[in-house]
Amino acid sequence: PGLKLGVGEALQCPTILENGFGGHRIEGIGDKHIPWIHNVKNTDMAIAIDDEDSQRLLRLFNTKEGQKYLKEELKLSDELIEKLTWLGISGIANVLCCIKMAKYYELTENDVIGTVLTDSAAMYQSRIEELNEMHGAYNVEEAKLDHNLHMLGLKTDNLMELTYTDRKRIHNLKYYTWVEQQARDVKDLNALWYDTKGTWDAVHAQAAELDELINEFNEATGLLKAL
């Protein structure tokens, strides 16, 4: 009963919040449609993140000047500073969603909030170079500004706590992408809303089988051995 589920999107493309569209710089997230595999019925909150926030923090976490600020001003450990480089653009956006959600629900040290870090900054080194060219050389004062404005300064704007009617409205948007354009059966669409046991619960019941397939894939590719 105490569990809340939030989903994020780019403020520049507020499909969930406003049935909107547009371009944005939060790479690695879907936009302009509601994914078939999004269980909208159990979603409690929709949160929009300004893509400028994630861009600024990407530079804060991944430049020498930004890391100097984190170490000397915020007294973060070298280990934590290193871990912040694991966050890519969409991962940073997810963390910002957590901050906004925590502020909205007035969470405290007695609460737990979690998210998924879907990418790494290693994928975006060229983007960091572009930001340096666009905004000029980074410095500690700018790092301080970015931290205070684009992280500490986040507010509870551009989010929505979803009612049952809100959720159904968002779910119904799937029709235009998946039934009209992708020839899915409308019965299957309705099942995603009305037949939780036969759809979402059935997927969760396959966890052990999916883990086995993941292990087989990792073994075949040698991915884990290379880490």
Give the ranges of each region predicted by the language model.
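Secondary-structure boundary elements
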Residues: 1-4, 104-108
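Short, well-ordered loop/turn elements at secondary-structure boundaries
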Residues: 42, 108-109
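Active-site/ligand-binding loops adjacent to catalytic centers
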Residues: 2-86, 127-227
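Glycine-rich phosphate/adenylate-binding loop
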Residues: 60-103, 109-122
